[in-house]
């Protein structure tokens, strides 16, 4: 009955369907070439779509650079194949325009499917409507909750949407963060004397805090753990590290935003205010994917007192707005030394050369997709530096690229370690 839920949207069959749809829509849109009276209209639409797509690539990848990682060329190709029938509407008349409009809708859906194959937020049809493993609630509802939530005759955790902006009177950063999402295990109610450790997670860029639960399966991972540990699990809180879906503040304190102060000072303070947690932040872990992974290492190297451990999944070698020079110019007023003063690689090298014990007691896990060559290179290098600087870290790869295929597995593989670092029995 539920076989449809397991239908893959990212396997070879799905890829074959995507390619077939792309060929079909393009071929139909090109049919007008064989007719002399419409040939130039079709060619005009084709050339215009190529120019617009190329222009979009230049703006996004070379000029604007809103994302720290380049987008795969296949995204631009699939988008261009959608723009072609869209522009054809302007060059056609009558019923042909209706056909082109239909092809445009199909091609746009196909482009979304291409993006999904690359980043895999929705690996199956069922992932669009996942089976809940925790009871979703507002923070107000959470405050009035006196017993562990139940589902299907068993105790489960709560998935709480919680305001966590750094704009309160006792906050320091002034960072207007989006709402965080927190998984609270059943033991929070069943055993109030427990001092549960915290795992703070950050999404990538583009991204939003709830992605760690909607696509990263963080609630499923935590539920699997608590189900075999008497309802006990680390509290998992996914927080905002960018300020907007496509924002890229590079996880630093700048004239525009104080993101590093928010994550190192305000987030722990606000979590302690809103939840009953282990007060010793050395039992806490901060982590993230892509931009979030880069940010986690930035926090640990700049503020080693804020957390005891970190997870860097598919992070970059350094915080970036595209190039080193662009980053220095836009965020540090052109001051290279100011950039180096907060850059993890430089801070680790300083600790190595000075022999300082700044990072003693800190542990971390670097994980990259085996096909994500830039992340493999960056994280293996940073792992080596981290160990030389006095941390205890490891580097590993899992099958996949720069996608949720990797990040779901990475979190599941490290969750026991996070719990153990937090003082829980594993």
From Swiss-Prot:
GO terms for molecular function: acyltransferase activity, transferring groups other than amino-acyl groups. PANTHER family: DIACYLGLYCEROL ACYLTRANSFERASE_MYCOLYLTRANSFERASE AG85A (PTHR48098:SF1), ENTEROCHELIN ESTERASE-RELATED (PTHR48098). Pfam families: Esterase. It comes from the Bacteria. This is Uncharacterized protein Cgl0967/cg1104. SUPFAM superfamilies: alpha/beta-Hydrolases (SSF53474).
